């Protein structure tokens, strides 16, 4: 017995006592070890990161002196700027990933039976994420945060609903004007209220996420359409017996995803913090303090994730009257309810997106409108838009998407690929949502750095420009290859010797990444730890976590992919 325990290892023995492998956790087929199936894990990793950093920031945040304590965190607390900027962008990336996760699940039919309740809770999680981010965004007491409070205040009061004023007082206390008060008790009343709501919503997010996780483990990830083309789409317990148990393979793969996600969350904002001329809505640094002379020249914007709503309130009705707050709120509520009830409104039993043409048209148009209205809201804030302008901007996408979806062939030839745990043949996606996200971030970062380098040709801007340029070229080539109809790359024909060679390359790749990460780790301790220059250490740590995540991905390939 003792010999068996030594062979199994201490960790295996502990997990055996806990009954992890007997727990009702989803067993995963080989082909699902693809980032597109794990977007929910990336959202969860972002959520966990924002909670951890938020707890540290809470130690230094003073509601009565919100803006001053924020500046203290940036300029005086060791690695405070790294914590604050990455906390902010952790929520930003969580929102982006939540949207990508939602639309990906729609196109894959993952909202259909038996996952209806999972979809409903997912939509509620997105709404709570936006709400928690709104209150957190306003805690800084900069002009943008206070303007966001005022916009929300005016929108709710303007509905004229009985009790609207009481609801506003319940949410915002004394209102945004309290941020301008010279009395710290008045300021504290506002920001204590905002902080309270921020924490409450994060708590509700955590509770609902646990329920969402339980539902996802109940039926597992939605199988590929080539495996289960119709509802109900899930693997039976008998089928799951052939797949990989949660420990250790799922744990290893998820760990790599967490590290890569955290690396991105750390690297992106700390890089952007060193780029001048960024749009104010995505700048990691706070805007000028509300009520300060510098704030007068700042264009009022809501958080970027509410820019679509910001533009919507600029719309004029056909009679030339501005859209009313009650109509705006009604549109949002009705849209949210329809989105939640989508599993019950779509009667089709097929998971193929080409057999769900009406809802594919609606959801694709929604995705385009979210982006289009957000960009429009940033470029032309507060400009009243007549019906003719609305038709000019919103009409073409509606028609073009409708024509494409209608003409898209319904039938599609697919190849059947074995999903047993012993089958190492995997069809690789040509491009994943994560690659698109990283490509967009890299390309935008390159464009901003290039613009900044032209204006301020400093050494650091030139150094940053080179890797960003190479990454942008690579990302654009990948995306263009996909758009122009490039064929997916498959590893079905891989021989045992080729897999063996790749495993050897992976082994030496792990060693190389480990050595590079050690060098970067040593470098990090030589970089400034206080003030804005601490962002260099933040970028360094982000790269280290990315390298560790990639190394674990290579380890996963070397250990678990069978020859």
Curated annotation (Swiss-Prot):
<feature type="transmembrane region" description="Helical">
    <location>
        <begin position="193"/>
        <end position="220"/>
    </location>
</feature>
<feature type="transmembrane region" description="Helical">
    <location>
        <begin position="81"/>
        <end position="104"/>
    </location>
</feature>
<keyword id="KW-0249">Electron transport</keyword>
<dbReference type="GO" id="GO:0016491">
    <property type="term" value="F:oxidoreductase activity"/>
</dbReference>
<dbReference type="InterPro" id="IPR027387">
    <property type="entry name" value="Cytb/b6-like_sf"/>
</dbReference>
<feature type="transmembrane region" description="Helical">
    <location>
        <begin position="387"/>
        <end position="409"/>
    </location>
</feature>
<dbReference type="InterPro" id="IPR005798">
    <property type="entry name" value="Cyt_b/b6_C"/>
</dbReference>
<dbReference type="GO" id="GO:0009055">
    <property type="term" value="F:electron transfer activity"/>
</dbReference>
<keyword id="KW-1003">Cell membrane</keyword>
<dbReference type="GO" id="GO:0022904">
    <property type="term" value="P:respiratory electron transport chain"/>
</dbReference>
<feature type="binding site" description="axial binding residue">
    <location>
        <position position="87"/>
    </location>
    <ligand>
        <name>heme 1</name>
    </ligand>
</feature>
<feature type="transmembrane region" description="Helical">
    <location>
        <begin position="358"/>
        <end position="379"/>
    </location>
</feature>
<dbReference type="InterPro" id="IPR016174">
    <property type="entry name" value="Di-haem_cyt_TM"/>
</dbReference>
<dbReference type="Pfam" id="PF13631">
    <property type="entry name" value="Cytochrom_B_N_2"/>
</dbReference>
<feature type="transmembrane region" description="Helical">
    <location>
        <begin position="36"/>
        <end position="61"/>
    </location>
</feature>
<dbReference type="GO" id="GO:0005886">
    <property type="term" value="C:plasma membrane"/>
</dbReference>
<feature type="transmembrane region" description="Helical">
    <location>
        <begin position="505"/>
        <end position="527"/>
    </location>
</feature>
<keyword id="KW-0813">Transport</keyword>
<feature type="transmembrane region" description="Helical">
    <location>
        <begin position="539"/>
        <end position="557"/>
    </location>
</feature>
<feature type="binding site" description="axial binding residue">
    <location>
        <position position="212"/>
    </location>
    <ligand>
        <name>heme 2</name>
    </ligand>
</feature>
<feature type="binding site" description="axial binding residue">
    <location>
        <position position="101"/>
    </location>
    <ligand>
        <name>heme 2</name>
    </ligand>
</feature>
<keyword id="KW-0479">Metal-binding</keyword>
<comment type="function">
    <text>Binds 2 heme groups (b586 and b606) which are not covalently bound to the protein.</text>
</comment>
<keyword id="KW-0679">Respiratory chain</keyword>
<keyword id="KW-1133">Transmembrane helix</keyword>
<feature type="transmembrane region" description="Helical">
    <location>
        <begin position="458"/>
        <end position="476"/>
    </location>
</feature>
<feature type="transmembrane region" description="Helical">
    <location>
        <begin position="436"/>
        <end position="454"/>
    </location>
</feature>
<dbReference type="GO" id="GO:0046872">
    <property type="term" value="F:metal ion binding"/>
</dbReference>
<dbReference type="InterPro" id="IPR036150">
    <property type="entry name" value="Cyt_b/b6_C_sf"/>
</dbReference>
<feature type="transmembrane region" description="Helical">
    <location>
        <begin position="119"/>
        <end position="141"/>
    </location>
</feature>
<feature type="binding site" description="axial binding residue">
    <location>
        <position position="198"/>
    </location>
    <ligand>
        <name>heme 1</name>
    </ligand>
</feature>
<comment type="subunit">
    <text>It is a component of at least 2 distinct terminal oxidases, the quinol oxidase (SoxABC) and the alternate quinol oxidase with the core components SoxM and a Rieske Fe-S protein.</text>
</comment>
<comment type="similarity">
    <text>Belongs to the cytochrome b family.</text>
</comment>
<keyword id="KW-0349">Heme</keyword>
<keyword id="KW-0812">Transmembrane</keyword>
<keyword id="KW-0408">Iron</keyword>
<feature type="transmembrane region" description="Helical">
    <location>
        <begin position="255"/>
        <end position="276"/>
    </location>
</feature>
<feature type="transmembrane region" description="Helical">
    <location>
        <begin position="326"/>
        <end position="345"/>
    </location>
</feature>
<keyword id="KW-0472">Membrane</keyword>
<protein>
    <recommendedName>
        <fullName>Cytochrome b</fullName>
    </recommendedName>
</protein>
<dbReference type="InterPro" id="IPR005797">
    <property type="entry name" value="Cyt_b/b6_N"/>
</dbReference>
<dbReference type="InterPro" id="IPR053595">
    <property type="entry name" value="Cytochrome_b-type_ET"/>
</dbReference>
């Amino acid at each position: 017995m003792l010999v068996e325990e030594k062979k199994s290892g201490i960790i295996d023995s502990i997990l055996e006592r806990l009954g992890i492998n007997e727990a009702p956790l989803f067993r995963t087929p080989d082909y699902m070890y693809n980032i597109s199936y794990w977007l929910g894990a990336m959202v969860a990793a972002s959520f966990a990161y924002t909670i951890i950093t938020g707890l540290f920031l809470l130690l230094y945040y003073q509601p009565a002196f919100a803006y001053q304590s924020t500046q203290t965190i940036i300029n005086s607390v060791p690695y405070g700027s790294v914590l604050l900027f990455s906390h902010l962008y952790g929520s930003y990336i969580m929102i982006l990933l939540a949207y990508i996760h939602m639309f990906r699940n729609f196109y894959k039919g993952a909202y259909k039976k038996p996952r209806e309740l999972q979809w409903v809770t997912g939509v509620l999680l997105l709404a709570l994420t936006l709400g928690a981010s709104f209150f957190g965004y306003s805690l800084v007491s900069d002009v943008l945060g206070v303007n966001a409070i005022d916009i929300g205040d005016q929108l709710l009061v303007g509905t004229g609903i009985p009790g609207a004023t009481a609801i506003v007082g319940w949410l915002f206390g004394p209102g945004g004007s309290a941020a301008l008060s010279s009395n710290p008790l008045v300021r504290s009343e506002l920001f204590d209220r905002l902080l309270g709501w921020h924490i409450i919503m994060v708590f509700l997010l955590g509770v609902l996420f646990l329920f969402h996780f339980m539902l996802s483990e109940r039926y597992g990830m939605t199988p590929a359409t080539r495996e289960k083309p119709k509802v109900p789409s899930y693997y039976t317990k008998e089928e799951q017996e052939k797949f990989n148990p949660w420990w250790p393979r799922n744990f290893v793969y998820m760990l790599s995803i967490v590290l890569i996600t955290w690396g991105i969350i750390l690297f992106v904002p700390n890089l952007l913090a060193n780029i001048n001329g960024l749009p104010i809505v995505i700048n990691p640094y706070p805007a000028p303090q509300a009520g300060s002379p510098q704030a007068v020249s700042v264009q009022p914007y809501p958080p970027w994730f509410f820019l679509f709503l910001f533009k919507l309130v600029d719309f004029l009705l056909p009679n030339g009257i501005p859209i009313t707050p009650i109509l705006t709120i009604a549109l949002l509520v009705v849209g949210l309810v329809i989105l939640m009830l989508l599993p019950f409104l779509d009667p089709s039993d097929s998971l193929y997106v080409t057999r769900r043409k009406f809802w594919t048209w609606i959801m694709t148009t929604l995705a385009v409108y979210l982006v289009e209205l957000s960009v429009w809201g940033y470029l032309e804030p507060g400009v009243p838009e007549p019906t003719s302008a609305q038709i000019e901007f919103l009409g073409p996408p509606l028609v073009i998407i409708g024509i494409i979806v209608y003409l898209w062939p319904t039938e599609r030839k697919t190849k059947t690929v074995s999903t047993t745990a012993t089958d190492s043949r995997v069809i690789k996606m040509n491009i994943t949502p994560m690659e698109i996200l990283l490509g967009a971030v890299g390309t935008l970062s390159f464009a901003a750095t290039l613009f900044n380098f032209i204006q301020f040709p400093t050494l650091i801007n030139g150094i940053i420009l080179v890797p960003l340029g190479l990454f942008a070229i690579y990302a654009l080539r990948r995306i263009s290859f996909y758009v122009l109809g490039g064929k997916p790359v498959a590893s079905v024909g891989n021989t045992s010797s080729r897999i063996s060679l790749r495993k050897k390359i992976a082994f030496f790749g792990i060693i190389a990444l480990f050595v590079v990460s050690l060098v970067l780790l040593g470098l990090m301790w030589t970089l400034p730890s206080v003030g804005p220059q601490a962002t260099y250490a933040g970028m360094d740590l982000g790269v280290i976590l990315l390298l560790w995540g990639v190394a674990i991905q290579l380890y996963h390939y070397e250990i678990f992919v069978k020859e």
